[in-house]
Amino acid sequence: MNITEKAKKIADSCRFCWMCRHICPIGNATGQERNTARARSLGVSLVVRGATELKEIADNIYECTLCGACTNNCMTGWDPKVFVQEVKTEIILNGQTPDYIIKLLETYQASGNVFGASVCTCLDEAFATKSDVALFVGQDALYKAPKSVKNAVALLKKAGVEVALDKNQDSGAALCHQPSYQ
């Protein structure tokens, strides 16, 4: 596996450490040890040492959201996101990207959002409003909870705050960190 020495050092430093185990939101949501920075780093170190194949850890690596909770709470200063991002690049370069990730990226590139959805017409009035104040709600709210967005705009208006809503809200920086997207 072709990752930097820095990434290898971080993976080796994290693989037997339990310090951030309770921090990972994915690990907490799934209740699975495999969804922690420690388990991911152990998998990476096994691939680096030739004890397992890259394809064996691909799904696990892509289950990391790159939220940075592990990094922000690391008392020793390591940044597991470094090896996760580099390994994601390796997975793509080796043609081992999980099918669900390829589908997600294709949907995003084709439609501009990960849902492949159109914006609800119930927000047309909010999009037409011009204001010095912009409201950024993100794509989850825009596509999955448009009525909540409409209610938030109405609430702000009642409070005397006129807001402009932009249709072109990105789903965040996470997708832009995908090597295949860059």
Language-model segments: which ranges?
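Iron-sulfur-cluster electron-transfer modules
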Residues: 2-4, 8-11, 41-182
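N-terminal structured subdomain of primase-like DNA metabolism proteins
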Residues: 1-9, 19-22, 26
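A broadly conserved sequence feature marking short terminus-proximal activation segments
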Residues: 16-44
